[in-house]
């Protein structure tokens, strides 16, 4: 149980970066070689929020993909900067995809994820914010992996305690 949970967490941690984008190069085209779930991540801020109509349109040969804002916005480090998973989408066919961001001014990105610090910070400018497209997994898979790692570690620890203290059985 512990090893399966840790395998899932390590896979999430080591997910591969597909492309780095800037808001200035709008729209951008990326060739995606593998099917699966991908995330659009905001680099430079521990907090990212859609204040209004900030949106992402992804098309492949004229077909629009469903892009959903993540409920649980995981944080990670990308080249020393804090990044936040913001959108996720599913790729079913390999090919060239066009990424177009709409209403970029409605994106609110701040350095700190703490509410008490965030109240006194200004919103980061678009020039200081970057975009990364990376592989990801679903939230439920991550939570199940985390729970399996914690429970597996606790069960293994309890087994070791009981193995070296046989008087606990009596």
What label would you give each PLM region?
Residues 1-170:
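Acidic, Ser/Thr/Pro
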């Amino acid at each position: 149980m512990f090893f399966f949970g840790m395998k899932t967490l390590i896979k999430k941690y080591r997910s591969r970066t597909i492309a780095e984008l800037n808001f200035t190069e709008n729209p951008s085209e990326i060739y995606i070689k593998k099917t699966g779930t991908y995330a659009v991540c905001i680099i430079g801020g521990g907090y990212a929020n859609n204040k209004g109509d900030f949106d992402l349109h992804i098309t492949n040969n004229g077909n629009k993909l469903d892009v959903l804002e993540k409920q649980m916005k995981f944080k990670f480090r990308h080249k020393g900067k804090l990044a936040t998973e913001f959108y996720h989408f599913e790729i079913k066919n390999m090919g060239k995809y066009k990424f177009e961001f709409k209403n970029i001014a409605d994106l609110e990105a701040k350095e700190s994820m703490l509410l008490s610090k965030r109240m006194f910070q200004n919103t980061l400018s678009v020039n200081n914010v970057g975009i990364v497209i990376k592989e990801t997994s679903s939230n439920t898979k991550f939570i199940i992996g985390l729970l399996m790692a914690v429970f597996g570690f606790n069960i293994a620890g309890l087994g070791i305690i009981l193995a070296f203290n046989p008087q606990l059985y009596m």
